[in-house]
Amino acid sequence: MAWRAGVLAPGLAVGWCLAVLLFAGLRLLGQHPGWHVDLVVLILLLMALSAWQLTHLALTLIGRRPAGWQSWQLVWRHKGAWLLVELGLTILALPLGLGGLSSRLLVRLPLPADFINYVGLNRRPVGITVAIIYIVVAGVCLLRGPWVFRRLAPQIRRPGSWRQMVVALLIGAGLMGVWWGLAEGIVTLNWWGDARLAAGLAKGLAAGSLLLIFLGFVVAVILAAITLVWSWCGQPAVSRPIPRRQGWWLVTLLVIAGGCVSAQALESTPQFAAMVAISHRGVDHGVGVQNTLGALRHVSQQRPDYVEMDLHETRDHQWVVLHDENLAVLAQRNATPHQLTLAQLERLTVHENGYHDHLVSWSTYLRTAERLHQPLLVEIKTTPQDSAGAVRRFAHQYGARLRRDGSAVHSLDYRVVAQLKQTAPQLQVGYITPFNWVAPASVPADFYSFQRISVSQQFILAAHQAGAPAWVWTPDSPAAMIRMWALGADGEITNELSRLQRVVRQRPGKNWWAVVQNFVFSCV
């Protein structure tokens, strides 16, 4: 009964419809990076409407049947508190996707490069700290949320208990779970259709699927919101509403909004662009030991655009080709590169995937790659033990040579990126993002290597707006590769190079399912 009253009671249906239209407008305008007046206006309108809708919904559920102006009056009286509440709810909802608005907001977040770099280099302790704070804040909201809401709507006589809040959250999670299951079923249907239907029919199926998924998401979110507010109000008995005839125009507006969002997802560019194929750590399908000459010689036969490999500084200030900061896994020796000289490291045998090989110096690896005419993507690893000026020495010694070879350098440490560009400005230098949470323009680079799990089309578009290619690491399954291709990534860094090369030889028209899948992921 609460769901029916929350949807059909006077004023609420129109309010939900307007909220969906504003939400759709934000998705449409927020697709491309940058702040615009119309985008800010839409955000402010959605915040104001959300406050009114929740207030009007609460008063309706407790049987007050207020006029619309009365709810607006109550919202205006508590406008400061509402602003704080909505900001808090937005922050809590950001990790949950915010209905696809999270990436549209985060890609516009400018922060100092030093702060971004600190978070990236200390991502584990920072991540744990943020997770603890998030859990504490979410717990406080769970326990005190109903009392805060009562202050915003004093007519509520008995606010909900924490048990009622837990039940409401479980119901909301269940609704989203049902939506997710149905959406994945629709994705599977599109995968089946792509393989069997003509190109036009497959694209039409994708268009209809996107519309259904969007409308289903809207319904699930509205019902979850009604359940939450009903629990904030103490789950009162709700009388049967007297619905007003809203007319088909409301349904028509929702379908039009959903159609616009679906069309944007289907037709947005870039999609299925030319792909740069990059072998991760110089390995293809587990043949050879990562970052060794044997693996390099094998993978170069597949002619990747780049072979990605890693460098660590040694105790005698040389460079060894190695990814791990400890040799325990590959060489069964509990030591770091900084504890051994290059000569000692070259004598070590490393084992992986049933193969064995020797560690190799950077100069030897580079000469071998040049003989094979194989461009490299060099990742410079950093530790607190690195010598002062190591990166600048690298740039002076190898910058011009790497540029002649058509090679590039990237790093997780933005200090490396900045120093290389200052010392060797003609060298192509990129920044590796451990996760995607700020405007790429905050950390300028020649290209970006985006972490795959949290990348979105908005981050790829932001990189393109800055004139930088967007590469993604490390999709290994065919499904992940196709999804990144459908997002518009310019390159993929993968452990399965030959698989990626087969994937990008497919016709894009046979992979509309990936566009639908990306849309599902964009909602959460």
Spans of features found by a protein language model:
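Hydrophobic alpha-helical membrane segments
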Residues: 1-275
